[in-house]
Amino acid sequence: MNNTALGAENKKEQTINFISEAYEKFYYEKLKEVRYQDVYHKALCYCLGISDDTRRNINSIYDFKTGCVKTECLHEGWQTSGSMKVVRMAFNLYCNGTPSVDDYTKTEEQVNECRRYTVEDLFCCAYAPFFWQAIQIRYPEYATYNRELYALFGGAD
């Protein structure tokens, strides 16, 4: 059975920006441990490598055996405001949603948690350029202008 995420990958080689050598090493090491080499897992590994805190606590965030995120990590004492942004961005790109919202039972708490996934909340930090890189990894087919595709639509917006 074909994995549709594999088909979503751009055939062009992509330059990936890293904050540090430790970050780059983490990314390539964790890619070997995930279950699939698709854009979902690449974006997850890239995002979770952004912060030293998330690199150190990767096993509290993601289960490499099951392929499931561990939303309870957002309540752990090691988290900082920055690492929580990193985790939420990673979860959003990997799960296509806001999985930690289900950790709450009260509607108001769920809404507040959902708000923490907004562009404004996530991108208002020093990690924003790396979040944009993660989006490009996750959505390579949309991250660059495609003249051929544009022409297929008659060159009109």
Which stretches of residues belong to each language-model region?
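Extended, charge-biased low-complexity segments
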Residues: 1-84, 88-91, 95-157
